[in-house]
Design a protein with these regions (language model features):
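A glycine- and small-aliphatic-rich helix-loop capping segment at beta-alpha/alpha-beta transitions
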Residues: 43-51, 74, 133-141
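N-terminal glycine-/serine-/threonine-rich phosphate-binding loop
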Residues: 1-29
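Short acidic/glycine-rich loop or secondary-structure boundary segments that cap or lie
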Residues: 65-67, 97-98, 125-132, 137, ...
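ATP/nucleoside-binding phosphotransfer catalytic cores, i.e., glycine-rich phosphate-binding loops
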Residues: 165-199
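Glycine-rich beta-strand-to-loop/alpha-helix junction loops that act as flexible
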Residues: 31-36, 120-124
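Ligand-binding beta-strand-loop-alpha-helix segment within the catalytic cores
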Residues: 10, 51-119
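Short, conserved loop/helix-junction motifs that constitute active-site signature segments
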Residues: 47-55, 82, 137, 161-167, ...
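Class I SAM-dependent methyltransferase SAM-binding "motif I" and its flanking Rossmann-like core
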Residues: 120, 124-160
Length: 199
């Protein structure tokens, strides 16, 4: 596994944005959940990167309202103060999945008009996004609903099919989490990881 810094990742994404612009492509960034990535939300350099994407989506989200402190999307909006119109909403004000959400995500990933990238976190039990089980890993859905016995909320997550449609995926972790992970790497996530970026 190759480990690089988060600054390397910022420069990679900056170059991808330049390439996409020259190719007349729209850009979509899928973000991960968790606390480590929230450090990027407070960086002016990263805010510039986020604002350069046409759309921001979340690869995994708990089935909670945006006002809830456990909402990945809600925390992103609260910390970054980014233009909310850039962010693709998942749940309505009643906590129900927006009609057409899966269709919109599928359109981004399959359309030749968009270049789609993801910054993906992973769990110490071996999952990435919210793909907790082997059943999740073999489902052919682009967007799926799942739940882990270790977590209290249902999740909306991208499936492995979505992973295959991304133009690029970049795994990200704190140094502390990476050290724990390297001491006991778990499937299935290690099968997908050849490069990781860390703070």
């Amino acid at each position: 596994m190759v480990v690089k810094t988060i600054e390397n990742l910022r420069l990679i994404l900056k170059n991808e944005l330049i390439y996409s612009s020259k190719s007349n492509k729209q850009t979509v960034l899928f973000l991960t959940g968790g606390t480590s990535i929230q450090k990027l939300y407070k960086s002016e350099k990263w805010l510039k990167i986020f604002n350069s994407f046409n759309k921001i989506c979340f690869a995994d989200e708990r089935m909670v309202l945006e006002s809830n402190s456990e909402s990945n999307l809600g925390n992103f909006l609260r910390i970054t103060k980014i233009n909310p119109k850039k962010v693709v909403k998942i749940l309505d004000k009643s906590g129900n999945l927006y009609e057409g959400y899966s269709k919109n995500i599928t359109h981004f990933l399959k359309s030749k008009v968009y270049n789609c990238y993801a910054i993906s976190g992973f769990g110490l039990d071996g999952h990435f996004w919210s793909l907790f089980t082997q059943i999740d890993m073999i489902k052919n859905d682009i967007v799926l609903r799942t739940k882990s016995t270790n977590h209290s909320h249902e999740r909306i997550t991208l499936g492995v099919k979505a992973y295959e449609l991304l133009d690029a995926n970049y795994f990200f972790a704190s140094k502390e989490k990476l050290a724990k992970y390297n001491s006991d790497p778990k499937e299935p996530v290690k099968s997908y990881m050849n490069k990781i970026f860390t703070l």
